[in-house]
């Protein structure tokens, strides 16, 4: 029984370490998009906090894959894991 409890504790700790730090990711976007994603980046982009979770996730995945042609955003999105993208897409709409 002690081994099972120990194993569950180790798994829970490992999972917590691997969790996406979405606030840290969002800070790296703030220079262009604003702290609450309320700005048009470089005066051109959509206002991201006005988008739905699904729209944000799709756009970031498309930037990552190259389907959306924007060299700056493609370079940024390629640094993100799919988990990071999902976490950002869920987090950003809460900043309104």
From Swiss-Prot:
Binds 1 heme c group covalently per subunit. GO terms for molecular function: electron transfer activity; heme binding; iron ion binding. Pfam families: Cytochrome_CBB3. Residues 1-19 form the signal peptide. It is found in: Periplasm. Heme c binds at residues 29, 32-33, 73. Its main location: periplasm. InterPro entries: Cyt_c-like_dom, Cyt_c-like_dom_sf, Cyt_C_IC, Cytochrome_c_Oxidase_Subunit. PROSITE patterns: CYTC (PS51007). Keywords: Electron transport, Heme, Iron, Metal-binding, Periplasm, Signal, Transport. Transmembrane segments: none annotated. GO terms for cellular component: periplasmic space. Belongs to the cytochrome c family. Natural electron acceptor for a formate dehydrogenase. This is Cytochrome c-553.
